[in-house]
Amino acid sequence: MYNIGMDKNFKVRVIVGLTMFVVALIGLYTFDSIPFKIIFGLFAGMSIVELFSFFKKKHRVFNIVLVLFETLFLILGTVFVARVDLNHFWYIILGVCGYDIFAYLFGKLFGGKVFKKSRPFPHISKNKTWEGTFLGLATSITLVAIKMGVQRSFETDWMFLLSGPLALCGDLFESFLKRQFGVKDSNEIIIKNKFFKFLELFVGGSEGHGGYLDRVDSTAFTGTVLLIIILVSYTPW
């Protein structure tokens, strides 16, 4: 059986999930405080710096529009996530991290056993498997649904069930953007960017940075779409 415990990418996902969990715990006591918003804004700022590193690759108008578009949803999504109350913040954390960790875990354990060599997104993210995608989404939705069931908040919070699927969409858009610019992953950008060198002191090398930034991107994408849904449906939050 595949040794998940020794897989670096899985460890990165777990570390990212735990980090966001710790951020949520900090928010439990300081959610409206300036330090909490600074921490969250720092993650978003790192992602924006990463995005503008893409300009070194190509300068076509289409690529610039893509970067500006993702920068827009990074800003909107981060503002939304930073302003929601703690209860809804937890929904987003459960949805995004639940999908990411379990999609990777189930993909490694069961990937290819049912759908063989077939891949759901071969031209965007060839390593994703049907098994991992389905089970990751199911786990994410289940975690959010359990929380809603306990709080009996389905009627007002139903849109947060989309946190996992939206995280997948954000991840795919990020993968598309990287392919468009000929970048394999966030690590490649960060290794070449001196701005991120100091992070190696805290996360033990460059392997973890891409994981952090990708999760911020997914969270921001999720936040942006949820904000649009809430504004359109006039649901209070």
Regions found by a protein language model. Give the residues of each.
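Short, hydrophobic transmembrane alpha-helix segments
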Residues: 24-37, 54
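Interhelical loop and helix-boundary elements at the membrane-water interface
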Residues: 1-18, 27, 49-225
